[in-house]
Amino acid sequence: MAGHDVKYGKHRTRRSFSRIKEVIGLPNLIEVQTLSYKNFLDEGLANVFKEMFPIDNFAGTMELEFVGYEMKTPKYTVEEARAHDANYSAPIYVTFRLVNKETGELKTQEVFFGDFPLMTEMGTFINNGSERLIVSQLVRSPGSYFHLKADKNGLESFGHTTIPNRGAWFELDTDAKGIGYVRIDRTRKLTFTTMLRALGFGSDEEILELLGETQLLTDTIAKDVHKNPADTRVEEALKDIYDRLRPGEPKTADSSRGLLVARFFDPKRYDFAPVGRYKFNKKLALKNRLLGLTLAEPIVDPETGEILVNTDTLVTRDVLDLIEPLLDNGLGNFVVEPSDDAVIPEPITLQSIKVYSPKDPERVVTLLSNGNPDAECRVLTPADVISNISYWLGLAEGIGKVDDIDHLGNRRIRSVGELLQNQVRIGLSRMERVIRERMSSSENENITPQGLINIRPVTASIKEFFGSSQLSQFMDQHNPLSELSHKRRFSALGPGGISRDRASYEVRDVHYTHYGRMCPIETPEGPNIGLINNLSSYAKVNEYGFIMSPYRRVDRVNGVVTDEVEYLTADEEDNYTVAQANSPLTEDSRFANETVMARHTGNNIEVEASTADYMDVSPKQVIAVAAACIPFLENDDSNRALMGANMQRQAVPLIDPHAPWIGTGMEHQTARDSGAALIAKHAGVVEYVDGNEIRVRRTSGELDIYNITKYRRSNSGTSYNQRPLARLGEKVEKGDIIADGPSMENGEMALGQNPLVAYMTWEGYNFEDAVIMSERLIKDDVYTSIAIEEYESETRDTKLGPEEITREIPNVGDEALKNLDESGIIRIGAEVKDGDLLVGKVTPKGETDPTPEERLLRAIFGEKAREVRDTSLRVPHGGGGIVHDVRVFTRENGDELPSGVNKLVRVFIAQKRKIHVGDKMAGRHGNKGVVSNIVPMEDMPYLPDGTPIDIMLNPLGVPSRMNIGQVMELHLGMAARTLGIHIATPVFDGASDEDIWDTVKEAGMADDAKTVLYDGRTGEPFDNRISVGVMYMIKLHHMVDDKLHARSVGPYSLVTQQPLGGKAQFGGQRFGEMEVWALEAYGAANVLQEILTYKSDDVIGRTRAYEAIVKGERIPKPGLPESFRVLVKELQSLGLDMKVLDADRNVLDLRELDEDEVMTRPDNTEITPEMLEAQEAIVAQAEAEEEALINADTEK
């Protein structure tokens, strides 16, 4: 027997064909979300307050300090927030201290700071009752970047950009004449020496001494001449910069200095963030550009005076390891003094080392670094600017290297915590202005922190982020896998990211640094391809937001591959050689072969085993969770694998799902981490189980009660239903699955079913990937799912009185009311069809003026019956089903309702959706198709033992698509079912051909794994042997019930009077230009006429046609289409006088073309204008009499 048994959870054992020992398990798959939010609450929120406070008034006499904050208990639990359409959030109270610096008086006060959204255990937020999540964002990291560019003549030059987290950009560039320029915040350029002079290096000699002589520098100095002798060189430089940033404004040296300080050196305006400072120091550190250069000075130990490395030594990795600690401790540090009129006249610490130029080995080049400022320094420093220029000049000498912006060392993840932190910062900065003004304007005696603070900017900023940000998304809740995948997704779009239209091919493409960090397979098809990605299965995000991948460390001294795992970021990995996960190892964990396949900076190379630094932990660390659920992924074309991964996320939860016979071993952890299953929080013994709750007695004696969710409507309209898995008296451990969620079976993910599939054609019904299905799958409810739709009705106060929910509805018979209760609301369990009443509701009608007779009757008998119209909630087309739940919210019960709403009723209707012709099905390998025919069981082809086939697929769907994994799954699946064992074949480490054939043989199947099939209609065997087996097939969310729709009469567009389009508007089918041509080609004049008139926009004609059909009369001739009239009006609005003529060339009024509408009374006598005038006179007289009576009363 090939393979070995592995236990997945308590309830499933699979035979696994994996050969590679995995030293670590998968991390918690949603920790990207949960850890980020936890860090935000623990540190991030306090840090923002510390950044913004203290705030002082303009006079500097008062100061408002931040002391601390506390989160109180949430108003609602998660379930209550969901039911009440509320937010799951906790009130936050911040303590402030107001200090009066003149009197020394302190006032400390706790201020309510709004409700703060809380994350659920599943990594989501409840916002207005619906589950949302914040997708992480992939953005350029702040730091120092250098790039190579070529002009149209092919001349290469280098450019530089300093990108801060917040603040002005600093760029360096070279023009065609070889002059270097600086550009501040995308304004006009000026020579880069101007910037150096502004920093306090006025003379040409100082600049040349600092940076060394290079062609670019000398050419630029020659261009940068002293224009105004009245100013010093430093002042002139400052004014030049001011002129570029504020053109046209009067400039002085002091205002120029102030502006430059504000742009780059003021922490309020400029911020690198810790990640920016880390990247900046790393880029400019001398140790990172010495490798491969020759030293032009000896390296001396500062403590002992010993020469460690001689002049003319080539710096290898070993030499670098020797001098690296010295460089970190400040070897080569020196201080330069800028002139007194510099922008910042303080001493500047730099670090230098002399090397020979690789392009001219005779020349000595001085490399400068910024002296490694500490992480607290989050602004640009003069040392940063100088060392940036030094690095840039060094590139022309062949020293240093340019950056690749698509390298994952230069792109980072902004997770939910950081995104929220930014929103709070935006809110606080808006609030700061208000606080400062109030502090300056109020009377000092009675001022309190509460009086100074207006929390609206902060709460508005957070609310706006959750409500309308591109990164705050409605959670994809089709099934557990789609939930998990959505939480692990990150997007390059959104605020501060790139836009879909400008994204180049390079940004979207797979990069070598994605290995083990970002999935190369799972990404959407269409305009977002490559911009929205998923985290690889083992990847984690570090504190700076860079994605790390785990590797086993290789002990190079004794050649052992240790079980010690290290997480490396993309730029750290570039320094090492990493062996592949499938490199064979001996019993004592050494490489079995002398050479191994390895990766180094994106190149796949064969290296000696002794030179490998690390080894991959697992073959599936390359890909994301959804792709890792596809067995035999290695045998599928990547385009089809992409579709397979994406389509698994669209699977509809079935009534009785089954886990696949052929899995990958990922099913259990995916189900557990998705948040859909119920997980034991503590170890204990199950004391009670039923459909609604599970009680577990902890070992410590306490009782845990777990509520089971039954048939809740998910975000996607599918049924979210949990089933208990734990048994009475069972011992459970912490982290065990005690109840299956939707699309789960025995603690494993179960998106579909395991039908018996044959690859064969059948009467042409599986042309173009269509799927032929046996009636058994309908009878046995194999592919039946439940759809739950929510409908709501609310009563409001109108100008004419309040709306009312009632059984008393005008013109509705008793039959229609039979399922409504006494208050007019449908009962739970009622079966309803299209158009049935769900909630009876009446709205007051606008009353017409009463006639004198009515007025008299009203005076005698009092208030007449109110005029109301029926505004009841009815079942829309295609919405029939069983009423599964009704919820009523009223103010009396203490429910929070929107203003103006008195009562809100929610009705949930569940539909049992059996599989139909037109529903979309798919396998896991991107093989999708639409059900084209449902064949009676007795007509389906059958096996020699009489078992009928369940599904027939077209064999032509395999060769051109190159997804051979489906065929391997088919054969192995048949063997697994025959043997009654579940199988795990992990991706890139699964069952080999030999394993499959051995298992097929073990199951007693034929040598070619094919079989003779018999035609169910004739009983004759088919000519050829056919591949028959078990394949995992899923039913997708694209169901025909949601798409099919029909209309006879319905709503029309206001202007054109043509029917609306689309199912949501109950619209018609568009008969477009090309369809009209088709009918014209056949000369079908009458059909054409009725399509362009009655069925479209001949308003009067269609009404008459309808009447005629109802009365059974001949249909009258059509009139004029409304669109003709619209065209005429359009031309008239352009000033073109357009007239319509009859056959005798008489001008017709457009209105005459329609026969006059005749107004009739209820007794069918015609109403004449005289009658109308007489009626008007009677009304006027009655009004005059009434007015006279009122006047007489007031006079009395």
Curated annotation (Swiss-Prot):
Keywords: DNA-directed RNA polymerase, Nucleotidyltransferase, Transcription, Transferase. GO terms for molecular function: DNA binding; DNA-directed RNA polymerase activity; ribonucleoside binding. GO terms for biological process: DNA-templated transcription. SUPFAM superfamilies: beta and beta-prime subunits of DNA dependent RNA-polymerase. It is an enzyme of class 2 (transferase). It comes from the Bacteria. GO terms for cellular component: DNA-directed RNA polymerase complex. It catalyses: RNA(n) + a ribonucleoside 5'-triphosphate = RNA(n+1) + diphosphate. The RNAP catalytic core consists of 2 alpha, 1 beta, 1 beta' and 1 omega subunit. When a sigma factor is associated with the core the holoenzyme is formed, which can initiate transcription. DNA-dependent RNA polymerase catalyzes the transcription of DNA into RNA using the four ribonucleoside triphosphates as substrates. HAMAP family: RNApol_bact_RpoB. This is DNA-directed RNA polymerase subunit beta. The lineage of its organism: Bacteria, Bacillati, Bacillota, Bacilli, Lactobacillales.
